[in-house]
Amino acid sequence: TAKGELLAIFDADFVPKPDCLRKLVDFFTDPLVGCAQMRWAHINGGYNLLTRLQTIMLDGHFVVEQTTRNRTGGFFNFNGTAGIWRRRAIEMSGGWQHDTLTVDTDLSFRAQLMGWKFVYLLDEEAPAEIPVEINAFKAQQRRWAKGVMQVGLKLYPRIWLAPLPYRV
């Protein structure tokens, strides 16, 4: 069990830059910041047509969607890797719950409902591999889609009823 105040999370296939943690930690001087998310980059983005298409899709999510949500104060989700969490934010939000496939999205939304702020770092990237084979890609997308639907059924009623700004 990790014991630190801040928890860095990286999947095994991610290759963060050696100085990335120093850059992310600075945001936690604000005691309300619960999570800092880096942008994903793609080690094998040019491998084949499938990886090129995924690069476009993922860049749309990370460059456009996550940036916009963060800059407008809207909810955005921690993408399961390439970031740092404040331990207290995880604990106060109910911890990692395993009733959805996308535990990252679930925890992200619960933490933001509790008032924790999230920071998205467009200029800090963590390169990783993306699926090069269609069946692996389809399985990944099915998991993500099912997980987000599970989170929706679990949390969207609370989100809609929460006294949050319209922009969320």
PLM regions and their residue ranges:
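Long helical/loop segments within the catalytic core of UDP-sugar-dependent glycosyltransferases
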Residues: 1-5, 18-101, 112, 134-166
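Generic structural signal for helix capping and beta-alpha/helix-loop junctions
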Residues: 45, 128-129
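Catalytic donor-sugar/metal-binding loop of nucleotide-sugar-dependent glycosyltransferases
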Residues: 99, 108-127
